[in-house]
C-alpha cells in the first residue's frame, strides 16, 4: 500500500466538514478538549517535552500539537485534511503558539525525515486509516533511536461498541453519529503486535474511562474501551 493509498477519503471528509468547530470546547470536539489534559500529562511525564522535537501524527485542528508546543516542545503536526490544518494554523496565529503544520502522510514524511524526532504521538487516529500497521511502522522509522512514541485508540469488543458508539454517539450524543466504525477499532494485542513488528518496545498501557455522572475522564487499568500505549525505539548497538 502506497502512502497516498493509506488514506480513507471518507474519514478525511468527515473531519473536514467539522473543522470550523474544532476549537469550540462545547462542539462535537468537546471530548478531545476534555481528554487533552490527561493525554498531555501522560506524554510529558514520560517524554519530558521541553526542547524535544515532536511529531503529532493526525494532528487535526491542533489541540494536542498546540498544547505540547506550550510545554516547550518544537512540534510538527501532520494531517491529510486541509481544512483542519487551516484551522490549526489560524488558531496558532491567534494564540501566539508556533507549530509547523504540514499536509502529508506519515509514510511520506518517514521517507523524507527518517530518525529525526525525539517524540512521536499518534492519538485517536489509527482507527481512521485503512492500514494502521503501516502508520506504526512509519512512526518507528521517523523516530530517533531512544525516542518515545505514544499511541491511543479504541478497543474492539462488545463493551466498546456499547460505550464508544451506542453511548457516545446515540445516547449521550457526545460525538456525531458515524464518527467511528466498530470494525476499525483495535485490540491492544493487535496494537502491541504491530509495535513489535516495527521493532518498538512497549513500555506501558493505560486505559481511559469516562464517568457520565461526574462528566470526567480518568486514566486507569480498564482498557476495555479507550487506551493509550507508550513505546520506545531501542538505541542502536554501538
Swiss-Prot record:
Q: Which reaction does it catalyse?
A: a 3-demethylubiquinol + S-adenosyl-L-methionine = a ubiquinol + S-adenosyl-L-homocysteine + H(+); a 3-(all-trans-polyprenyl)benzene-1,2-diol + S-adenosyl-L-methionine = a 2-methoxy-6-(all-trans-polyprenyl)phenol + S-adenosyl-L-homocysteine + H(+)
Going by the UniProt record, its keywords in alphabetical order are: Methyltransferase, S-adenosyl-L-methionine, Transferase, Ubiquinone biosynthesis
**What Enzyme Commission number does this protein have?**
2.1.1.222, 2.1.1.64
Pathway listed for it is: Cofactor biosynthesis; ubiquinone biosynthesis
SUPFAM superfamilies named in the record: S-adenosyl-L-methionine-dependent methyltransferases
Q: Which residues bind S-adenosyl-L-methionine?
A: 39, 58, 79, 123
> What InterPro entries does this protein's entry cite?
Methyltransf_11 (IPR013216), SAM-dependent_MTases_sf (IPR029063), UbiG_MeTrfase (IPR010233)
Q: Which domain of life is it from?
A: Bacteria
Q: Recall the GO molecular function terms of this protein's record.
A: 2-polyprenyl-6-hydroxyphenol methylase activity; 3-demethylubiquinol 3-O-methyltransferase activity; polyprenyldihydroxybenzoate methyltransferase activity
GO terms classed as biological process: methylation
Q: Give the similarity note.
A: Belongs to the methyltransferase superfamily. UbiG/COQ3 family.
The record's annotation in HAMAP family points to: UbiG
Question: Briefly, what is this protein's role?
Answer: O-methyltransferase that catalyzes the 2 O-methylation steps in the ubiquinone biosynthetic pathway.
What is the protein named?
Answer: Ubiquinone biosynthesis O-methyltransferase
Amino acid at each position: 500500500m502506497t502512502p497516498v493509498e493509506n488514506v480513507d477519503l471518507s474519514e478525511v471528509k468527515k473531519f473536514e466538514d467539522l473543522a470550523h468547530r474544532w476549537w469550540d470546547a462545547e462542539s462535537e470536539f468537546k471530548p478531545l478538549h476534555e481528554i487533552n489534559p490527561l493525554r498531555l500529562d501522560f506524554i510529558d511525564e514520560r517524554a519530558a517535552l521541553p526542547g524535544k522535537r515532536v511529531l503529532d501524527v493526525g494532528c487535526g485542528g491542533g489541540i494536542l500539537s498546540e498544547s505540547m508546543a506550550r510545554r516547550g516542545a518544537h512540534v510538527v503536526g501532520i494531517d491529510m485534511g486541509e481544512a483542519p490544518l487551516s484551522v490549526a494554523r489560524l488558531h496558532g496565529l491567534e494564540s501566539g503558539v508556533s507549530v509547523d503544520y504540514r499536509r502529508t502522510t506519515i509514510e511520506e514524511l518517514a521517507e523524507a525525515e527518517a530518525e529525526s524526532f525525539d517524540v512521536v504521538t499518534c492519538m485517536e487516529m489509527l482507527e481512521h486509516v485503512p492500514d494502521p500497521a503501516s502508520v506504526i511502522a512509519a512512526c518507528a522509522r521517523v523516530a530517533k533511536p531512544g525516542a518515545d512514541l505514544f499511541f491511543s485508540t479504541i478497543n474492539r469488543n462488545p463493551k466498546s461498541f456499547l460505550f464508544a458508539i451506542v453511548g457516545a454517539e446515540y445516547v449521550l450524543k457526545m460525538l456525531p453519529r458515524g464518527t467511528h466504525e466498530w470494525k476499525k477499532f483495535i485490540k491492544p494485542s493487535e496494537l502491541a503486535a504491530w509495535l513489535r513488528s516495527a521493532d518498538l518496545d512497549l513500555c506501558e498501557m493505560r486505559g481511559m474511562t469516562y464517568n457520565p455522572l461526574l462528566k470526567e475522564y480518568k486514566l486507569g487499568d480498564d482498557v476495555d474501551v479507550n487506551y493509550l500505549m507508550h513505546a520506545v525505539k531501542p538505541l542502536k548497538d554501538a
